[in-house]
């Protein structure tokens, strides 16, 4: 098995390369907050020498309640993304939920994300593939790791092989997720880059009746465990005031802890990737 390298400007995304950080905020709450968070991430990752892609959503279409905040929408969201990209010279990733969003979003961002709940929607997969953008596929909570090959095949047959696979936890009874570390290793056998969404793996879906709960206190332990697998990247969201974030605050890393947090993740990644491979199957 060879590791596929996805090129993004000067960034190389691959399981055997230094990890890439996909991070930012869950949903765009305001232009000013997005700029503040992007600036913090850019400064910290530049200081630590970590390749970085800014992430935020313009619409959270799958909230628990119809009254929950969803975001500014695509038109306003893309304006904010363009300003972040030009101001900080950052590549961008965001998610799409409908076929008509794919082409205009791909004109602004570098990576478009297929949400976990929509990962089997063929029309959406084909529309995303046709943009020729890099695709980040969130593994559905209800799929086994080996079933990701079907989604990969759909993208390939639609003409796109610039694929990243993202683990975000698996359903474990009601209102709970667990992370199968061996499952991430199984996805790595595809050769495609695998990244770990340590933020949403902390969720307790529906745990607060009308919104998801989370286990922010375990953010460090979970991410360190994932990084020990030798992954292509880490997906982490942060907020200056997680308790008052408009979406997934219980899972968000406090923004002021970002540098200390990433320092540990980089140390784990550097150490693991310095080891020689051991084939224990023989």
Swiss-Prot record:
It is found in: Cytoplasm. Its EC number is 2.5.1.55. The keyword Cytoplasm applies. The keyword Transport does not apply. Keywords: Cytoplasm, Lipopolysaccharide biosynthesis, Transferase. One of its GO terms (cellular component) is cytoplasm. It is an enzyme of class 2 (transferase). Pathway: Carbohydrate biosynthesis; 3-deoxy-D-manno-octulosonate biosynthesis; 3-deoxy-D-manno-octulosonate from D-ribulose 5-phosphate: step 2/3; Bacterial outer membrane biogenesis; lipopolysaccharide biosynthesis. One of its GO terms (biological process) is keto-3-deoxy-D-manno-octulosonic acid biosynthetic process. It catalyses: D-arabinose 5-phosphate + phosphoenolpyruvate + H2O = 3-deoxy-alpha-D-manno-2-octulosonate-8-phosphate + phosphate. GO terms for molecular function: 3-deoxy-8-phosphooctulonate synthase activity. InterPro entries: Aldolase_TIM, DAHP1/KDSA, KDO8P_synthase. PANTHER family: PHOSPHO-2-DEHYDRO-3-DEOXYHEPTONATE ALDOLASE (PTHR21057). This is 2-dehydro-3-deoxyphosphooctonate aldolase. It comes from Shewanella sediminis (strain HAW-EB3).
């Amino acid at each position: 098995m060879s590791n596929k390298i996805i090129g993004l400007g000067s960034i190389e995304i691959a399981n055997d390369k230094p990890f890439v950080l996909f991070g930012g905020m869950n949903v765009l709450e305001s232009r000013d907050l997005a700029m503040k968070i992007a600036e913090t991430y850019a400064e910290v990752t530049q200081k630590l020498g970590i390749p970085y892609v800014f992430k935020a959503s313009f619409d959270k279409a799958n909230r628990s309640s119809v009254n929950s905040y969803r975001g500014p929408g695509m038109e306003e969201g893309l304006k904010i993304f363009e300003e972040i990209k030009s101001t900080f010279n950052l590549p961008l990733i965001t998610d799409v939920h409908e076929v008509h969003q794919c082409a205009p979003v791909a004109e602004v961002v570098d990576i478009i994300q297929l949400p976990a709940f929509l990962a089997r929607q063929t029309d959406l997969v084909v529309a995303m593939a046709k943009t020729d953008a890099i695709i980040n596929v969130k593994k559905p909570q209800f799929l086994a790791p080996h079933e990701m090959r079907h989604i990969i095949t759909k993208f390939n047959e639609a003409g796109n092989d610039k694929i990243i696979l993202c683990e975000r936890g698996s359903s474990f009874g009601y209102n709970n997720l667990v992370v199968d570390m061996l499952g991430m290793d199984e996805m790595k056998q595809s050769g495609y880059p695998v990244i770990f969404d340590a933020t949403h793996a902390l969720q307790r879906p529906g745990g607060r009746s009308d919104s998801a709960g989370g286990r922010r206190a375990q953010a460090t332990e979970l991410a360190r465990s994932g990084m020990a697998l030798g992954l292509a990247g880490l997906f982490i969201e942060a907020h200056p005031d997680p308790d008052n974030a408009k979406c997934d605050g219980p899972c968000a890393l406090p923004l002021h802890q970002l540098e200390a947090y990433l320092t540990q993740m980089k140390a784990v990644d550097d150490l693991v990737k310095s080891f020689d491979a051991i084939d224990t199957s023989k």
